[in-house]
């Protein structure tokens, strides 16, 4: 189910995920990376969740870019409710809300990990911006690896206090980047 316009760009998108409780540095980096994606005409795919997801999507659409919000509920039930305005901006900026569930389906806990496979599957690459040891972002990274996607972490905040999960991904082979352009240089 889609609300809005699904971008016609194949897999040429970047999925960005992270903690719902980011540090100040994580917020700045999410806004920066989202804006960089907009400047490069690279749609941002994320879960419209509190924290890194919504900051990266906000950075993208505020810079004139396109974003896809993959929901763990129906497209007529934006969750969290605090992101209703962001969801409207995503739709009005030629992006969309996407869900595998009927339009008015409620958000239930078990649906969040399930939708992560869609977040990673829509893009060529996944950026785990900031993630603690136990994070849904790490579930998304596992899906990305299973799907043959490249996984990146953010070099600038790699050693931040809330980033043990991303640091673990880096130690397991994820590439650390400082900008979106670094992703293309690693291809």
Regions found by a protein language model. Give the residues of each.
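Glycine-biased, small-residue-rich flexible motifs in mid-sequence functional cores and linkers
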Residues: 1-187
């Amino acid at each position: 189910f889609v609300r809005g316009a699904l971008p016609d760009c194949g897999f040429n998108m970047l999925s960005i995920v992270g903690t719902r409780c980011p540090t100040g540095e994580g917020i700045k980096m999410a806004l920066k990376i989202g804006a960089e994606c907009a400047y490069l005409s690279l749609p941002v795919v994320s879960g419209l969740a509190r924290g890194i997801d919504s900051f990266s999507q906000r950075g993208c659409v505020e810079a004139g870019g396109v974003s896809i919000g993959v929901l763990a509920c129906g497209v007529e039930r934006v969750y969290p409710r605090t992101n209703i305005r962001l969801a409207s901006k995503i739709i009005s900026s030629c992006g969309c809300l996407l869900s595998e569930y009927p339009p008015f389906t409620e958000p239930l806990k078990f649906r969040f990990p399930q939708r992560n496979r869609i977040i990673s599957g829509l893009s060529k690459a996944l950026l785990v911006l900031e993630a603690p040891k136990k994070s849904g972002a790490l579930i998304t990274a596992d899906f990305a690896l299973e799907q043959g996607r490249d996984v990146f972490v953010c070099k600038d905040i790699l050693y931040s206090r809330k980033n043990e999960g991303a640091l673990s991904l880096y130690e397991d082979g994820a590439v650390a980047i400082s900008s979106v352009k670094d992703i293309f240089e690693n291809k």
